[in-house]
Each structure stands twice: as C-alpha cells, then as structure tokens.
C-alpha cells in the first residue's frame, strides 16, 4: 500500500501536469478548495470557448468570445450542491452561469447553462459565511426553463 506521502507526490505531479498542459488559462490547480473549481473553469472555458479572467476574480470567471462579451460565472462540484456569493456581496450578477458536476471517473455533466439572474433569484438563505447554496436538483429544474437562445453554445465536449 502506498503511503500518504507517496499519494500526495502523485497528486502534486498531476497538478504540475495540469498547470503545464493548460498554462494558457493561467490557473493554479492547488490541492485545496480551488482544485475542482480551477479544473471546472478550464473544462467550461474549453467547452464553450470562453476567455477566463484572472484567477480568483470576484463573481465573474470568464467572458464570451462571441462578440457579446457576456460575463460568465463558472461553478464545478463533486457534491449535490454549489455555493454562490450572496446578493449583497457583489455589484452585479453575471450574465450567464454554467455549473458542472465532475464524478470520480473524471467525467463531467452540465447541470445548468443559462442566465445568472435565474440562479440568483432562486438561491437559498445566506449562510454565516455570506454564501448561498442551491442544489443540483434545483439547477436541473431551472435548466428546463431556459430556452436554447439563452444558453451558451457548446463548442466541444
């Protein structure tokens, strides 16, 4: 059986490869809460042909390249919900929100692709940390209400 140290070294090598292979996106794949978020941002940027903002920019993670320059917030999760900053912590919600879930096999599923306003109108009560949660089940339900014209078009999956 490999030691924790051996496993961590493997993980750090993977992180180094991710950062090298996706350097154009200027993301750090740190082994903390940012890892899934950074991976999700890169997946979504490539799937929807988006320009990513600097890492850790508040609320806005990317902009569309289609000439409309819409703002996009990207969320990735491995659990059954995602968190958003509560309404009083930002000036304007993003034009679009894309939420994906990533399973342990590394496959991702699109959970929501649509207007930011619809998400922010349906968030739960803010927690003490200023974050509001929404379940993936609720996101899937909201997604059914989003017309194709209000979704970002897939470039590739």
What does each of the following model-derived ranges do?
Residues 1-157:
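Nucleic-acid endonuclease domains
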């Amino acid at each position: 059986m490999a030691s924790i140290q051996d496993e961590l070294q493997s993980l750090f090598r993977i992180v180094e490869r991710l950062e090298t292979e996706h350097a154009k996106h200027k993301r750090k794949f740190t082994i903390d809460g940012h890892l899934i978020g950074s991976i999700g941002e890169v997946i979504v940027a490539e799937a929807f042909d988006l320009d990513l903002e600097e890492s850790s920019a508040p609320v806005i993670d990317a902009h569309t390249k289609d000439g409309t320059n819409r703002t996009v917030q990207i969320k990735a999760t491995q659990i059954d919900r995602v968190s958003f900053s509560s309404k009083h912590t930002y000036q304007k919600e993003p034009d679009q929100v894309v939420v994906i879930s990533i399973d342990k096999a590394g496959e991702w599923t699109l959970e929501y692709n649509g207007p930011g306003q619809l998400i922010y109108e349906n968030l739960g009560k803010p927690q003490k940390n200023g974050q509001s949660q929404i379940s993936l089940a609720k996101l899937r339900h909201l997604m059914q209400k989003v017309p194709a014209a209000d979704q970002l078009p897939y470039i590739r999956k």
